Amino acid sequence: ADLPVSRLRTVVEAWAFRTAEISKMEGIEQIFPFENHGQEIGVSLAHPHGQVYCYPFIAPKMEKELQHTEAYHEKTGGNLLKDIMNAELEAGERIVMRNHSWVAYVPAAARWPLEVHVAPVRDVLTLDQLNDEERWDLASMYSHLLKRGNAFFTEHIGHPSAKAETSRRIPL
């Protein structure tokens, strides 16, 4: 949360670069970039750091989510994730913030006290497909969300920030 937006933009660039490079590798089915902040969540390093997990399969939770998005698309012709975001925008009750490129909202069935989902306004499948403005907007939103979360506590909060991607096409 203390990093300037320009440094968080570097994190977004790293996610996008690694996604693009790993996507070229044979046998990779799921890419999972994430950042860890704080020993409270079980990290062994005291400083914030990122990693990228790459799987030769789609993890069970992601597989289930893909099945739901595909079934929804077959039934309605729509994009489940986009329709959820639009419903959240219409209701307006759980919107945390919005900028030109992204919407941050608390999901209806949040599993954690400070859980926030960040969704792109434009249909994109992977981080490397983001344009320059979207990358800056994501870095800016990420900064604001971290600061808002930390405002609830006397110490910085420990948290993971994750983006699950898959090589399978999601119906847009």
State what each model feature region is:
Residues 1-172:
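HIT superfamily nucleotide-processing domains
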